[in-house]
């Protein structure tokens, strides 16, 4: 008889339902918060990647401008040489507001034509993110460029 009385007594059922709802809501809140934090981190990584990319672009553009200034004197004196001549690569580091670009200007011969390749490695200050860009053009026609 006492067994039936215990089963029919529903005084504590509401408390169990409330606790169950609180546990479920806590789990959902934790999952949403974890997803939010993960998305914020991903956005920061992508933002750093874009910034490093544009630092690398700036490095290529600075190097190209240096080759083109003074009536292309650096380009003609250093890179416009015989096809069998060895050209020593030029290197420099350009410091920008939010990072650095390691620049290498090298030359190679392909199908009897001399090409110049500007390689720029963009590094963002305060981050390990780096991006590398390359621009290639023929010595005779620097206006026609190929980006890699």
Task: Place the predicted regions along the sequence by residue.
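Surface-exposed loop/turn motifs at beta-strand-loop junctions within extracellular Ig-like
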Residues: 23, 122-126
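Residues within well-ordered beta-strands of beta-sheet-rich folds
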Residues: 119-121, 136
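Aliphatic-rich helix starts adjacent to a transmembrane/signal segment
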Residues: 13-55
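Acidic surface patches and DE-rich sequence motifs
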Residues: 9, 96, 124
């Amino acid at each position: 008889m006492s067994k039936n009385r215990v089963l029919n007594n529903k005084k504590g059922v509401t408390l169990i339902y409330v606790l169950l709802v609180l546990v479920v809501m806590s789990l959902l809140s934790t999952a949403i918060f974890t997803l939010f934090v993960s998305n914020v981190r991903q956005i920061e990584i992508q933002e750093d990647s874009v910034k490093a990319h544009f630092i690398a672009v700036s490095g290529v553009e600075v190097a190209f401008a240096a080759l083109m200034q003074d009536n292309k004197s650096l380009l003609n004196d250093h890179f416009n040489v015989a096809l069998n001549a060895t050209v020593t690569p030029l290197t420099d580091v350009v410091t920008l507001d939010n990072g650095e670009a390691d620049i290498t200007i090298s030359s190679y011969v392909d199908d009897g034509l001399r090409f110049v390749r500007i390689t720029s490695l963009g590094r963002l200050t305060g981050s390990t993110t780096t991006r590398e860009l390359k621009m290639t053009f023929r010595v005779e026609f620097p206006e026609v460029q190929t980006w890699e």
